[in-house]
C-alpha cells in the first residue's frame, strides 16, 4: 500500500538534504549556480527524482546546463551517501536528476499573456473611434414604426 503523505515528506527531506549538500559538501565549481527546485519520490520509496535549475554567472550569461548535468551525475553517489546518512529509512532511494523546465515554460506563458494583453489594448483603442457599418439599428424597420 502506497503512503503518499510519507513519500511527500521523504521527498521534501531529500530536497533539503541534496540542496544543502550541493551548497556545502560537494566541491565542484560547476554546481555553484544550481538550485534544487523539487523532488519526487516513487510510491515504493526506492527512486527519487531531483529537479534543478541552473542560472548563469550574471543575468546576461547563459547557464552551462551540460556541465551542471555532468557534475550532478558525477556527484550522484556522494549525494546518495549523504542522503542515506541523514535519513532513517531502510532503503536509501536512488537519485536521478532532471532539469526543471517550469521556469522556461512559465516565462513563455507570461510572454504569450503579455502579447494578448497588448493586442486587447490595441483593439480597445480601435473600438473607441469605430462607427457601425450601415445603420445604427439595422434590424429596425422605420416604416413599420410609422404605421
From Swiss-Prot:
Composition bias, Basic and acidic residues: 137-147
Subcellular location: Cytoplasm
Molecular-function GO terms, alphabetical: ribosomal small subunit binding
Keywords assigned: Cytoplasm, Ribosome biogenesis
Top-level lineage group: Bacteria
InterPro entries according to UniProt: KH_dom-like_a/b (IPR015946), RbfA (IPR000238), RbfA_dom_sf (IPR023799), Ribosome-bd_factorA_CS (IPR020053)
Entry keyword annotation includes Cytoplasm: yes
GO cellular component: cytosol
Predominant subcellular localization, coarse grouping: cytoplasm
This protein's record includes keyword Cytoplasm: yes
Gene3D superfamilies to which the protein is assigned, alphabetical: 3.30.300.20
GO terms classed as biological process: maturation of SSU-rRNA
Region (Disordered): 126-147
PANTHER family xrefs: RIBOSOME-BINDING FACTOR A, CHLOROPLASTIC-RELATED
Description of how the protein assembles with itself and partners: Monomer. Binds 30S ribosomal subunits, but not 50S ribosomal subunits or 70S ribosomes.
The family this protein is said to belong to: Belongs to the RbfA family.
HAMAP family, A to Z: RbfA
Primary role: One of several proteins that assist in the late maturation steps of the functional core of the 30S ribosomal subunit. Associates with free 30S ribosomal subunits (but not with 30S subunits that are part of 70S ribosomes or polysomes). Required for efficient processing of 16S rRNA. May interact with the 5'-terminal helix region of 16S rRNA.
Record's protein name: Ribosome-binding factor A
Species of origin: Corynebacterium diphtheriae (strain ATCC 700971 / NCTC 13129 / Biotype gravis)
